[in-house]
Amino acid sequence: MEIVKIHKVDDFFENPDEVRAAILQMEFQPPTDTDNWHGVRVVPTDRVVAGVDLEEMIDEEVKFRIPNFTYDEMVLAYHITSEEIRNHFDVEFEQASKHFDGDACRIVGLIYLTPNPPKNCGTSFFDDEGNKVTELENVYNTMIIYPADILHGPTNPFGDTKENSRLTIVFFLKKYK
């Protein structure tokens, strides 16, 4: 099996509470019939939240961690996953939530924004046969960055309101050529 680097950045925002509060004020929407994700999301038109230019911060961190990587487009979303989404699957959640972020997507990442989350509610990574290889814990204000072609998914959903559920900023870096 190929060894792949997963980057972890602690204490990503200087003001995570303000960023979180601003995001929670937004109108989250469920997926459309053509979307391939579960939960609710906001796809922002303005990438500045609580005085933070998210695109610039993410871009700088990715370039620092993966110096030779270039991309054509960054897609951002604020994503909430609650305990309720378990009802959408007939199999164990961790098995059902495994996925690749394909097409033109090359690098993906997320920033955890729920304070004091339960244990075992981070992001799981799997080998090509679907066996769990590792899990990164959901730690408030931590960013993770990884290749889009790694099989992965949220380990466990939690919460029953947008304030106490799994809140993340997800980003997808796409290369079209």
What are these regions (language model features)?
Residues H79-K177:
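Catalytic core of non-heme Fe(II) oxygenases with the double-stranded beta-helix
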Residues M1-A96:
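Non-heme Fe(II)/2-oxoglutarate
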